Amino acid sequence: QMVCGDGVEYLRAMEPAQLIYIDPARRDEHGARTYAIEDCTPDALALRDLLLAKARYVMIKLSPMLDWRKAVDDFAGTVAEVHIVSTGNECKELLLVLDGKAAGATSAVAAADTRAPHVYCVNDDQRLDYDAAAYTRGLRIGDAPLPHELRYLDEPNASIMKAGCFDVVEARFGAVQIGPSSHLFV
């Protein structure tokens, strides 16, 4: 079924669904790019409760320029998954999956600190995923001593860089970050 009309009006009138996918326009009325969620059309933050009242899951495509942690905070405890998608080592998409059941949809603000999302970093055929709660509290970056024998210098792919999950890289791959202000590993 194809419906031509105002998407927000359709959202208000539609029957409940399992999933709603929303790709807000990231250009203003003058054609300039916008990055903040509330500057996009429609404003997914303003529609959060309505979206979650109409679907168990809501997938929102956002600007890859956004700080995903702030976006998660902005959606106040409703974000179950963060997908950072890159191709050719260039970050292309930031997708948030909201779960209405997890936050109760009516008391999302009360649930804000009760759960952290699962983060998926994808770059072509490379994938790294982790539970944000396990790795983003008290990040320690570049604390480990460097190994005596240095054979490789590694730079994470764009999705991992965007996620900022350098402690996950250290834990999963036995790599050591060369310094607190560096994103290079040995």
Task: Name these PLM-found stretches.
Residues 1-21:
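S-adenosyl-L-methionine
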Residues 21, 26-186:
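Class I S-adenosyl-L-methionine
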